């Protein structure tokens, strides 16, 4: 009976077949210890001289890393074995042998080497754990919104304009010289969806032509972007907190083994799963950053009216044991579509959610302008071509209502939950300013 490693605990004292690859091998006297991987996990298999045909024992002594195998044996519970179980091998069959020396041996390798061989590095424990957690987060995102009655709404990747009027766009030439751009966000289209279906979410790749070499930036990354009709700024933040606490709790519940592989202490994530995220206004956050800057020379002062940089976000987020909201920024440093604060029109009803431990922003959201004339004026103030946004203005001409939404960056969220130093490890094949291969 063929089984997978992630279900091995259900087959103790049973004869099973595993199909996979040799990850590591060592020998001690009359025992060969084979660490097998099958895409669902890693398992120790023991080949004992005298318990298998001599030809099988000799074969096991000369298997190179990444040999593809079929292995038959009995599952045993053994606390000494990695994962608490092992396979007592009865027989094995080589399906294929590596053609040459496998590049990623047991010695230490630098990150550039590993990224050059990303197509092979994905087979190893660390990327395995990260991708399993990423997969769990994606599944949980769909479950979260599906259970709350949201419609999955697919936004186009080719768009005629930028969402926020930025120049950081990848341009694509279409037919007859017409130009389009790779989407930076599905938000504008999600707004159309929300006014048709009340509550929607988009989930897909987005593109930013940023010449950034920071640990938080990719050229291509994934975002989930919900949008809800009649939702206020306060309700928007409540939904963000509910989502993030749900995601963290799901990983703690189902991916503790992978967190252990990464050396990530689950206790560091438990406060985030509980909710109760602090809220700071932009003004309060600037004051806190400047107090920190007086104590820490690595944190630059932040004049009021400027946006937070990575050092500011990191310094702020380290003061909290769970994500923290920063809300109500000056309108002049935020996007044209954000609703002004009725208590102070110089501010907007927006928020950023910063992950703790120095990870910084993982969510940006706002209440959107729903008044036609105000939105038209903002488009003009930002120097944007009104004809490109005419369809977007239609959303305000016909049945306009207050509405809100946000975008959660998947890779930044994965990096925080996994405790990664760089977002390049949070996506299978990262696309960065300095890397486009493999």
Curated annotation (Swiss-Prot):
InterPro entries in UniProt: Aa-tRNA-synt_II, aa-tRNA-synth_II, aa-tRNA-synth_II/BPL/LPL, Asn-tRNA-ligase, Asp/Asn-tRNA-synth_IIb, NA-bd_OB-fold, NA-bd_OB_tRNA
Compartments, as annotated in UniProt: Cytoplasm
PANTHER family linked: ASPARAGINE--TRNA LIGASE, MITOCHONDRIAL-RELATED, ASPARTYL/LYSYL-TRNA SYNTHETASE
EC numbers on record: 6.1.1.22
Gene Ontology terms, MF aspect: asparagine-tRNA ligase activity; ATP binding; nucleic acid binding
Protein family according to the UniProt entry: Belongs to the class-II aminoacyl-tRNA synthetase family.
Domain of life according to the entry: Bacteria
The organism of origin for this protein: Thermus thermophilus (strain ATCC BAA-163 / DSM 7039 / HB27)
Catalytic activity, reaction form: tRNA(Asn) + L-asparagine + ATP = L-asparaginyl-tRNA(Asn) + AMP + diphosphate + H(+)
Protein name listed in UniProt: Asparagine--tRNA ligase
CDD domains per UniProt: AsnRS_cyto_like_N, AsxRS_core
Keywords: Aminoacyl-tRNA synthetase, ATP-binding, Cytoplasm, Ligase, Nucleotide-binding, Protein biosynthesis
GO cellular component terms, semicolon-separated: cytoplasm
Enzyme class: ligase
Biological process terms in GO annotation: asparaginyl-tRNA aminoacylation
Quaternary data: Homodimer.
């Amino acid at each position: 009976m063929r089984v997978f490693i992630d279900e091995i605990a259900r087959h103790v004292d049973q004869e099973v077949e595993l199909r996979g690859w040799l990850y590591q091998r060592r020998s001690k006297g009359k025992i060969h210890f084979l660490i097998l991987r099958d895409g669902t996990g890693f398992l120790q298999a023991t080949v004992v001289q005298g318990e298998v045909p001599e030809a099988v024992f000799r074969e096991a002594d000369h298997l190179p890393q990444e040999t593809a195998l079929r292995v038959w044996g009995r599952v045993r519970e053994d606390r000494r074995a990695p994962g608490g179980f092992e396979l007592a091998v009865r027989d094995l069959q080589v399906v294929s042998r590596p053609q040459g020396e496998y590049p990623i041996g047991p010695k230490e390798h630098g990150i550039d080497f590993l990224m050059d061989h990303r197509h092979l590095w994905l087979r190893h424990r660390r990327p395995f754990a990260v991708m399993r957690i990423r997969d769990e987060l994606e599944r949980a995102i769909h479950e979260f919104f599906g259970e709350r009655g949201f419609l999955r709404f697919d936004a186009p990747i080719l768009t005629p304009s930028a969402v926020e009027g930025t120049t950081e766009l990848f341009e694509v030439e279409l037919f007859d010289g017409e130009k389009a751009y790779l989407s930076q966000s599905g938000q504008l289209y999600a707004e159309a969806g929300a006014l048709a279906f009340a509550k929607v979410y988009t989930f897909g790749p987005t593109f930013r032509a940023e010449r950034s070499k920071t640990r938080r930036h990719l050229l291509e990354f994934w975002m989930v972007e919900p949008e809800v009709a009649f939702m206020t700024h306060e309700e928007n933040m409540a939904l963000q907190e509910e989502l993030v606490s749900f995601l963290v709790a799901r990983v703690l519940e189902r991916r503790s083994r992978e967190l252990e592989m990464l050396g990530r202490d689950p206790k560091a994530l438990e406060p985030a799963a509980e909710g109760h995220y602090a809220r700071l206004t932009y003004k309060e956050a600037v004051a806190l950053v400047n107090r920190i800057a007086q104590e820490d020379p690595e944190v630059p002062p932040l004049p009021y009216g400027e946006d937070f940089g990575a050092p500011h976000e990191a310094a702020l987020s380290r003061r909290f044991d769970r994500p923290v909201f920063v809300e109500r920024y000056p309108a002049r440093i935020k996007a044209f579509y954000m609703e002004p604060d009725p208590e102070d029109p110089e501010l907007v009803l927006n928020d950023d959610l910063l992950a703790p431990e120095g990870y910084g922003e993982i969510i940006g959201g706002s209440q959107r302008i729903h008044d036609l004339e105000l939105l038209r004026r903002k488009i003009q103030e930002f120097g944007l071509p009104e004809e490109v946004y005419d369809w977007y203005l239609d959303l305000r001409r016909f049945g306009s209502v207050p509405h809100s939404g946000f975008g959660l960056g998947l890779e930044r969220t994965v990096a925080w939950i996994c405790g990664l130093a760089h977002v390049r490890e949070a996506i299978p094949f990262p696309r960065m300013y300095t890397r486009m291969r493999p």
